[in-house]
């Protein structure tokens, strides 16, 4: 009896077993049958514009991409009717496209139009090519990163479909009502004046050369970059001489093969946010030609954001440090590696000997690889015998991790981004993934737009996700825990909780109900400013949803009660049975490409690699045997405690890698004073950051494109990155530098490649026991989560990470926000902008990004602006008890009343947010309460030019539609259908 999940079809007379529900084209592709499909994008629904995929199914001509196969179906791929229809379809496309493949910038072996024409044996065109628009002015070069040539556009609609329904940025469409249809941006404006957010998805999927990265123009080919007045006669000459396209294609194939000899394509993992996008980087020498995502990428597939696609100029920036620097007589002097490393080792070693093991501290990095983080904690624990090691998760994610450890036993995402996309309801609290985690946000936007997913957003600011949501709530700052607990209490009171799940899986329910007694609807309304009706509506939406995922970020964690609010999120999910199942669970959005990995590798004062606690005697003994030293069973100092220890004179030296502590720590004025007081300070970085300016020695490291290694994303997914470029100047990978320092202090390490380091780490860490470079080869990945070492996409399938396998309700009350004197009457929020990454040390090296966002500014509500006499461009000074900044105002309804918003992408003392923030911190983890800052405002100047250019997409309106709307093409006057 045939499996109901499979069907049988006949393809050109051959019987094939196939998936039930698969389209005919799916079956062809899954069985390796090469077939035309110019407009097909596997990641989206069938586009149905090119008609090159037509087949005959049970005697009818149909589009194979949109026709679901039926059991017993007879499919003909080679009959005369099929071939005639396909040829007509291709002729209609080629009428819109001039074939000049040999001199084309896109002749790189991956041009779908070229390859399909060759596959089909096309020799001549039925319809001669004619341009749609005046060639002298048709090409839109307005955008900093890519260009569009309508006269090469075949109107296949791939770019439109992905913009509308995969990225869901909703900028592109095809004007099917034109005499000659073409792609348009918004209402037909130049690209750079549109709502385009520069994700580059359109360029990635374009099957020809209509959309091209500007960085590719004239760069890839041996015969590209030829001027128009020479190129056009060459094209005409070739067409007149050659008897058909076959000969022309043969020449272009030779040229494409020549390109392969100098164009290197290397798989890498993005170095910006925590989503973990992977893609190919195309290089020629040290030139980065383009970023090309592929369907095999496990997280993003073909998607990117502006930074991942276009934000790599920093790699070749002239501001890179390429030689070691030693401070002599108050100024930096270039030195040799020998001199610099000898000095670092001797000074750090002598300080340890003179002042003791606790006199040296280590700050690791969320930007460097897992392997490099591992050797940094090993340097601290083995060579310096100290647990004084931490990373930037202290500034952001430690409270989320703490809340999860207390409730479910593991500090990571419950599932994957695919689970988020599957959820019936997504709740986003204190996060702005459309700007901070853009590719992850696309999956939520797509599920919400097309698949009925519901969306709740809780934020002080009306960001893009709030605009799209079914319910947007804006509670008073620092009160998220109150409404979360009120929702939980209300659901329990109504009997909407999952009692069976709780009985089987969770401890302390009765104690938890006692804790909830205070959190009535009336209490929550008074504290949060939300209406009781909103709180009830949230409860009802959770009740009705088939799976709830909660995503949260710095708006939760960077508060005095960040850990307890994170625990409250987990409590709500436990009470409603939203763990241990797909499409549900807790998702703290990790901010950096490898902040998850930095923690996983043990660069934490209380944790050894693989989340083995420093107080665990057995775990510690294992590392002691491997390292040959005794490891202190007491946690070391975290980032914040290290600064206190420096101030108190107890810590004399610090070794900091890939972190701009002088800008990212709170109360920056005070931090600067502290760093200046160190006896010896080593900074390892790719730029002379603000922090590096306080160093005694600066060691030049390499960015991700110049080394091998692994990163771990927000899903707990480990992925390999491969060296794409040679190191610049004398810069070295961080793992090499650390090993050289360690060996000068007697360590005798002998790592020859990061794979050696990974193997050692995995041998000591059960979570990674079955991970290896072989497992991670190519596009493969590994998700930690099982102490028997298996890859674990969904956590807790075998129970929660406690001895009895049961989770625990956290019993925590709300902590009030930090108090400020009355004169500080405005609350100032902060966060990322889409175009920039954090303080901008990398993205501010990109001319294109800087053109989109040239300045930092403060967002002010229309109400406050009217009250205080502020307009766009007004110069204002913001003053807190801890410092002051001066910058221009941007009036926007994204903020309301007395709320201000200051993007964090500034390295300037005049405008960086942390010259305002103070010492308040999360009570459990010491994470600074960056979000609890109040200021007063002084208006210094009148109306000037708005600090956000008119060409920034925030000033534009989106144009949503459901994909390409191919029906409009079919309804054009005179359109002749090729299907039956």
Curated annotation (Swiss-Prot):
GO molecular function: 2 iron, 2 sulfur cluster binding; 4 iron, 4 sulfur cluster binding; formate dehydrogenase (NAD+) activity; metal ion binding; molybdopterin cofactor binding
Positions of the 4Fe-4S His(Cys)3-ligated-type domain: 81-121
Sites where the protein binds [4Fe-4S] cluster 3: 163, 196, 199, 202
Keywords linked to the UniProt accession: 2Fe-2S, 4Fe-4S, Iron, Iron-sulfur, Metal-binding, Molybdenum, NAD, Oxidoreductase, Repeat
GO terms for cellular component: membrane
InterPro entries on file: 2Fe-2S_ferredoxin-like_sf, 2Fe-2S_ferredoxin-type, 4Fe4S_Fe-S-bd, 4Fe4S_Fe_S_CS, Asp_de-COase-like_dom_sf, Formate_Dh-H_N, Formate_DH_asu, MoPterin_dinucl-bd_dom
Cofactor (UniProt): [2Fe-2S] cluster; [4Fe-4S] cluster; Mo-bis(molybdopterin guanine dinucleotide)
Residues involved in [4Fe-4S] cluster 1 binding: 97, 101, 104, 111
GO biological process, any: respiratory electron transport chain
Residue span(s) of domain 4Fe-4S Mo/W bis-MGD-type: 263-319
Matches recorded under NCBIfam families: Fdh-alpha
This protein's name: Putative formate dehydrogenase YrhE
């Amino acid at each position: 009896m045939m499996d109901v999940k499979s069907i049988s079809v006949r393809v050109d007379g051959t019987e094939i077993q196939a998936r039930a529900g698969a389209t005919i084209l799916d079956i062809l592709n899954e069985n390796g049958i090469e077939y035309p499909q110019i407009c097909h994008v596997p990641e989206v629904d069938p586009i149905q514009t090119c008609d090159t995929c037509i087949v005959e199914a049970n005697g009818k001509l149909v589009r194979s991409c949109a026709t679901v196969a039926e059991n017993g179906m007879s499919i003909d791929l080679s009959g005369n009717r099929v071939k005639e229809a396909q040829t007509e379809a291709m002729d209609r496309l080629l009428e819109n496209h001039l074939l000049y493949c040999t001199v084309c910038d896109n002749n790189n072996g991956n041009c779908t139009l070229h390859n399909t024409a060759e596959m089909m044996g096309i020799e001549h065109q039925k319809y001669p090519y004619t341009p749609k628009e005046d060639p002298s002015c048709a090409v839109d070069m307005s955008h900093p990163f890519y260009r569009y040539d309508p006269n090469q556009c075949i109107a296949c609609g791939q770019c439109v479909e992905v913009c509308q329904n995969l990225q869901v940025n909703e900028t592109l469409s095809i004007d099917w009502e034109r005499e000659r249809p073409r792609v348009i941006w918004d209402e037909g404006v130049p690209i750079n004046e549109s709502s385009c957010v520069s994700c580059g998805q359109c360029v990635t999927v374009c099957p020809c050369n209509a959309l091209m990265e500007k960085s590719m123009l004239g760069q890839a080919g041996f015969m590209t970059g030829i001027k128009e007045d020479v190129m056009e006669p060459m094209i005409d000459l070739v067409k007149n001489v050659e008897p058909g396209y076959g000969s022309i294609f043969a020449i272009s194939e030779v040229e494409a093969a020549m390109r392969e000899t100098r164009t290197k394509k290397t798989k890498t993992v993005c170095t910006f946010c925590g989503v973990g996008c992977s893609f190919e980087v195309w290089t020629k020498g040290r030139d980065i030609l383009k970023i090309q995502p592929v369907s095999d990428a496990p997280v993003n597939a073909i998607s990117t954001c502006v930074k991942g696609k276009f934000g790599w100029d920093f790699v070749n920036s002239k501001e890179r440090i390429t030689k070691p620097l030693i401070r002599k007589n108050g100024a930096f002097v270039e030195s040799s590696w020998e001199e610099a490393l000898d000095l670092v080792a001797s000074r750090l070693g002598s300080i340890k000997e003179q002042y003791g093991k606790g006199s040296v501290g280590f700050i690791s990095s969320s930007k460097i690889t897992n392997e490099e983080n591992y050797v940094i904690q090993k340097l601290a624990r083995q060579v310096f015998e100290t647990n004084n090691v931490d990373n930037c998760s202290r500034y952001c994610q430690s409270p989320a991790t703490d809340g999860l450890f207390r409730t479910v036993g593991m500090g990571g995402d419950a599932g994957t981004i695919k689970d988020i996309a599957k959820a019936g309801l997504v709740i986003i609290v204190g996060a702005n993934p459309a700007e901070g985690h853009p590719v992850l946000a696309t999956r939520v936007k797509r599920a919400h737009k097309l698949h009925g997913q519901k969306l709740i957003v809780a934020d002080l600011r009306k960001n893009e996700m709030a605009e799209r949501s079914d319910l947007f709530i804006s509670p008073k700052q620092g009160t998220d825990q109150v409404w979360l607990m009120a929702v939980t209490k209300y659901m329990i009171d109504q009997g909407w909780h999952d009692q069976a799940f709780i009985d089987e899986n969770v401890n302390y329910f009765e104690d938890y109900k006692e804790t909830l007694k205070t959190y009535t609807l009336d209490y929550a309304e008074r504290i949060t400013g939300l209406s009781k009706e909103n709180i009830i509506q949230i409860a009802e939406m959770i009740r009705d949803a088939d799976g709830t995922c909660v995503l949260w970020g710095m708006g939760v964690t960077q508060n005095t009660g960040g850990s307890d609010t994170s625990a409250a999120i987990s409590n709500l999910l436990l009470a409603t049975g939203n763990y241990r199942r797909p499409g549900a669970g807790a998702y703290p959005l990790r901010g950096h490409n490898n902040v998850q990995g930095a923690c996983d590798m043990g660069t934490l004062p209380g944790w050894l690699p693989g989340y083995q606690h420093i107080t665990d005697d057995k775990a510690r003994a294992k590392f002691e045997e491997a390292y040959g030293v005794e490891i202190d069973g007491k946690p070391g100092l975290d980032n914040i405690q290290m600064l206190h220890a420096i101030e108190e004179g107890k810590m004399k030296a610090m070794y900091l890698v890939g972190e701009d502590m002088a800008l990212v720590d709170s109360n920056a004025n005070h931090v600067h004073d502290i760093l200046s007081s160190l006896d010896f300070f080593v900074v390892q970085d790719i730029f002379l950051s603000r922090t590096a300016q306080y160093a005694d020695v600066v060691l030049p490291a390499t960015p991700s494109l110049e080394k091998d290694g692994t990163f771990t994303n927000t899903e707990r997914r480990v992925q390999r990155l491969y060296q794409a470029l040679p190191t610049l100047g004398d810069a070295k990978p961080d793992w090499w530098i650390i090993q050289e320092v360690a060996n000068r202090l007697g360590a005798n390490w002998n790592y020859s490649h990061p794979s050696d380091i990974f193997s050692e780490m995995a041998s000591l860490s059960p979570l990674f026991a079955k991970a290896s470079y072989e497992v991670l080869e190519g596009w493969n990945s590994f998700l930690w989560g099982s102490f028997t070492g298996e890859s674990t996409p969904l956590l807790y399938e075998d129970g929660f990470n406690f001895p009895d396998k049961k989770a625990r309700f956290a019993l925590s009350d709300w902590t009030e926000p930090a108090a400020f004197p009355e004169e500080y009457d405005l609350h100032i929020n902060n966060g990322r902008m889409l175009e920039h990454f954090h303080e901008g040390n990398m993205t501010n090296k990109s001319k294109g990004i800087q053109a989109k966002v040239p300045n930092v500014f403060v967002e002010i509500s229309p109400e406050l602006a009217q009250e205080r006499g502020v307009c766009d461009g007004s110069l204002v000074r913001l003053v807190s008890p801890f410092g002051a900044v001066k910058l221009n105002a941007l009036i926007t309804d994204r903020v309301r009343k007395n709320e201000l918003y200051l993007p964090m992408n500034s390295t300037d003392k005049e405008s960086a947010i942390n010259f305002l923030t103070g010492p308040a911190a999360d009570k459990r983890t010491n994470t600074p309460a960056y979000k609890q800052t109040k200021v007063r405002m002084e208006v210094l100047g009148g109306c000037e030019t708005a600090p956000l250019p008119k060409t920034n997409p925030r000033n534009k309106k989106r144009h949503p539609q459901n994909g390409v709307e191919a029906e409009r093409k079919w309804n054009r006057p005179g359109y002749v259908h090729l299907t039956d």
